[in-house]
Amino acid sequence: MPDPSGFLPSQDGLAFTNAWPSEPAVVLPTPFGKINIGNAAAGLCGGMVFAALDFWHTGIQPPATRPAPGEPLYRYIVQRLVDSWHLPAGVAQYYQWMNLPDGDSGFEAFGRRVVTDRGLAWRTIQTQWPQIAADLDQGTPAALGVVTVASASPADLGFNHQVLAYGYDASPSEVTVLVYDPNSGQNDGIYIRFDPRTPTEPTTFAHNINISHPVRGFFRTAYAPVPPPAS
């Protein structure tokens, strides 16, 4: 399966998984009030995705040892976690998508379907996926926000996830996106797979990401490289 970016989790992913000791919570000031996105024990997925991509951009091999809380690498990953939420727009996008249906909403009028709102399938397949594929075709991995819950509660924002797309295989009936999942470590076999033919309807996003929730949709996040700390 093509990996046009040249990124591989087995060589470019962080050598440790997204499992951390209990530490004081990371709290984000959002349009919905302050949101607790962890205690680090709940995971630093976005920080690990951004960190791996930072190391890849600089051509530096990521450290092989998990940092202890308080060490420069740990503080850097936590800061990149905050960056990955792209305040306030990024948090607002997660929240908006959490409150959208899986398929399009609308009604029948004069024998025609009138769409009142696009669902997550359409937004993922028609809007986000072409941008992600364009990044990959140009050799650049794409950081993804993965929406996993349907909820109007801002407290549930932390149930969403982040991964890094680095390759894909596409046919008219099936798209398989290769992703680096911090929860799965340096595993080259992690994917998200979907049928792009009916984006107006609820679509199954099959996956083997190491999370307990389904994938409802995903979008390209606002990533900008930051030099990682010196080892």
Where are these regions (language model features)?
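Non-catalytic, low-structured ubiquitin/UBL-interacting segments
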Residues: M1
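Cysteine-nucleophile protease catalytic domains, especially the papain-like/related folds used
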Residues: G6-Q126
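Structured loops at beta-to-helix junctions and adjacent beta-edge loops in soluble globular domains
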Residues: A19, M48, V147, Y180-P182
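Short loop/turn segments at secondary-structure transitions that flank enzyme active sites
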Residues: S22, A51-W56, A150, D169-P172, ...
